[in-house]
Amino acid sequence: MKTDYLKFVKWSNEDDLYIGYCPDLFIGGACHGRDERKVYAELCRLVANDLQRRKREKQPLPRREAIVAMHLAV
């Protein structure tokens, strides 16, 4: 099974922060911060750690099912 899960960072006006998401592994936001690049780097670290833990504990990897749709204003 492939381990390239969808990861993205989104600005939250409500929180006034960037929030990092990986919907197939974590419910809701996994990390947050004011610097978009740092949030993405932290998200990648969290995903890698979670996948290593699952492998070490012989847990099955979740299916990659996340789909992101964007509404584009014209």
Model-assigned labels for residue ranges:
Residues 1-8, 34-37, 41-74:
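Short, charged, surface-exposed hinge/linker loops at domain edges
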Residues 27-32:
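Short, well-ordered beta-strand elements within core beta-sheets of diverse protein domains
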